[in-house]
Amino acid sequence: MKKYTTALWFLVCFMMLQMFIPFGIEQVWNATTGNSDETIEKLIIENSVPTIVVIILFFAMRWTPFTRAYMQSRPWGVFFWIVIAALGTIIPSAWLQEQLPALPNVLEQEFNDILTNRWGYIAVGILAPIGEEMVFRGAILRILLTANTQQPAPDSRQPSPIIPIAISAAIFALIHLNPAQMPHAFLVGMLLGWIYWRTGSILPTILFHWVNNSTAYVVYNLLPQSQDMKLIDLFGSERAVILSVVFSLLILLPAIYQLHLRMRRV
């Protein structure tokens, strides 16, 4: 029970920082500039500063342990297939999203505004992958997996990690506070949880997260209209959409298999 309380404490700390720091920034911004309008610069600062504080806090308190052991194992093959897998999830995820009932995209405009600014990449492409992986995989999932292994299992078998991974993925999806992002965030959270469980390191998950967010940034800036388009609008026909999904799966599934072969704890 103590470990579950610890995991809950990590989540509460993350949420409190994400809530109160932006509020404080807004008050200071409005008082110093005399302008209460929501600007892109203010949005970027409100998204970046809490994440920086999260990174510093979780590192300083050792809530997310860091060692050199994983990098010393020279996991270059794992990193390569992580990048391939991350790229392979993009189109299938978009296709699956289109098959689901339309969900409210309450943060769409704010997210798009951040993506239009070069400094927004620091918030979305660099800080978010590091901060979120430190919290959701390096802290919360780590504690849940530890608690899970301490539970008695029938026939002395190793307890399955699926429940801790699913719990952390669900929390990861809900914390985005945007229903339209939750299905993708949950599925990616499951994959990231599996990667963390197999490696015991957040470096591969940070890399995956970075590729995912960086791709969103690049696509939006190359094709700003893509946010309002479906895959059929991009590829021109239903047949081309299906072929793109199949091609992506032919990238994703072998990448996952290679990761299964290569990933190990050190």
Model-derived features with residue positions:
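N-terminal membrane topogenic signal
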Residues: 1-13, 240-242
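Alpha-helical transmembrane segments in multi-pass membrane proteins
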Residues: 12-62, 80-81, 243-244
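Hydrophobic residues within alpha-helical transmembrane segments
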Residues: 13, 127, 167-171, 207, ...
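Functionally important transmembrane alpha-helices
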Residues: 15, 19-27, 181-235
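Juxtamembrane helix-loop-helix connectors linking adjacent transmembrane helices
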Residues: 31-32, 37-42, 64-134, 141-148, ...
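Structural signal for the C-terminal ends of transmembrane alpha-helices
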Residues: 57-66, 195-199, 253-263
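C-terminal membrane module of polytopic membrane proteins
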Residues: 210-266
